[in-house]
């Protein structure tokens, strides 16, 4: 049994957060989210009609009892992100926000300057801000200092499925963070998610690897188990890596 995750005084028993894009249909999306055990699902504000409770994305999440994490994907600067956040809060009655600002549509790299600027203002306005950002230890510390409830550094570019290519920087971020660290983007296999948890990440967010799988519902189960396994291993002390062989049995001669 692992310890619960706390973000902004809200407890989560699952450390797997999920996205809602790229699923074949809304029913499969709902089934996968439920099977994943996730308690927090993010959705792009540009893809939903927040004023319509029957929306194909919004309704399945809400009827499944999963908490909403609106995101500002598509915003190109702080001004656009703040405007989108204000609309979401009014329509959905939530202060929770995944802040995403990526002006380049080809690589979807988060803009660090605009993200920090928007985060500071949104925190001032009372939002619970979870910013998607580069795996930059200095930036993550600055985001923490302006009041973000967690930081969400990337493991690899969005949708790349490359896994944890930013390991060295993630380890620094995790080591110095005083808020939860949620590894977001690039996680393409359950083993990637388990590895992120073994490094000490507090949670992971997975979308493409579940939604685009041949069987998204079964893949959601695989990720649920991987996250649980990785966190359990981290909490109970992984053995250190050695460049030499270390015997597990006595080294005395066989006939002694």
Swiss-Prot record:
Which SUPFAM superfamilies does the record associate with it? ThiG-like
Its recorded reaction(s) are: [ThiS sulfur-carrier protein]-C-terminal-Gly-aminoethanethioate + 2-iminoacetate + 1-deoxy-D-xylulose 5-phosphate = [ThiS sulfur-carrier protein]-C-terminal Gly-Gly + 2-[(2R,5Z)-2-carboxy-4-methylthiazol-5(2H)-ylidene]ethyl phosphate + 2 H2O + H(+)
First-tier enzyme category under EC: transferase
The record's keywords, sorted A to Z, are: Cytoplasm, Schiff base, Thiamine biosynthesis, Transferase
* GO MF terms held by the record: thiazole synthase activity
| One Gene Ontology cellular component annotation held by this UniProt entry | cytoplasm
Q: In which pathway does it act?
A: Cofactor biosynthesis; thiamine diphosphate biosynthesis
According to its UniProt record, the EC number is 2.8.1.10
The biological process GO terms on file are:
thiamine diphosphate biosynthetic process
Active site per UniProt = 98 (schiff-base intermediate with dxp)
List locations, semicolon-separated.
Cytoplasm
Q: What is its main location?
A: cytoplasm
Claim: 4Fe-4S is one of the keywords in the record: no
Is Transferase included in the keywords of this UniProt record? yes
What is this protein for, i.e. what is its function? Catalyzes the rearrangement of 1-deoxy-D-xylulose 5-phosphate (DXP) to produce the thiazole phosphate moiety of thiamine. Sulfur is provided by the thiocarboxylate moiety of the carrier protein ThiS. In vitro, sulfur can be provided by H(2)S.
Assigned protein family: Belongs to the ThiG family.
On assembly, the entry states: Homotetramer. Forms heterodimers with either ThiH or ThiS.
- The name under which this protein is listed is Thiazole synthase
Species in which this protein is naturally found: Aliivibrio salmonicida (strain LFI1238)
């Amino acid at each position: 049994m692992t310890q619960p995750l706390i973000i902004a005084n809200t407890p989560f028993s699952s450390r797997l957060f999920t996205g809602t894009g790229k699923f074949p249909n809304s029913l499969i999306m709902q089934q996968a989210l439920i099977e994943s055990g996730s308690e927090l699902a993010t959705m792009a504000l540009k893809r939903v009609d927040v004023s319509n409770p029957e929306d194909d994305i919004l309704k399945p999440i809400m009827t499944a009892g999963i908490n909403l994490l609106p995101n500002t994907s598509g915003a190109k600067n702080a001004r656009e992100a703040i405007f989108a956040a204000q609309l979401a809060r009014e329509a959905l009655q939530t202060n929770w926000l995944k802040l995403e600002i990526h002006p380049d549509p080809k690589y979807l790299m988060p803009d660090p300057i605009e993200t920090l600027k928007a985060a500071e203002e949104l925190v001032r306005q009372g939002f619970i801000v979870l910013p998607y950002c580069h795996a930059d230890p200095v930036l993550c510390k600055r985001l923490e200092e302006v009041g973000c409830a967690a930081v969400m550094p990337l493991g690899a570019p969005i949708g790349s499925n490359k896994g944890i290519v930013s390991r060295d920087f993630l380890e620094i971020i995790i080591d110095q963070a005083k808020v939860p660290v949620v590894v977001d983007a690039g996680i393409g296999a359950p083993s990637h998610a388990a590895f992120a948890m073994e490094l000490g990440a507090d949670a992971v967010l997975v979308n493409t690897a579940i939604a685009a799988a041949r069987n998204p519902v079964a893949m959601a189960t695989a990720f649920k188990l991987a996250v649980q396994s990785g966190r359990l291993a981290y909490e109970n002390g992984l053995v250190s890596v050695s460049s030499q062989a270390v015997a597990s049995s006595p080294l005395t001669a066989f006939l002694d």
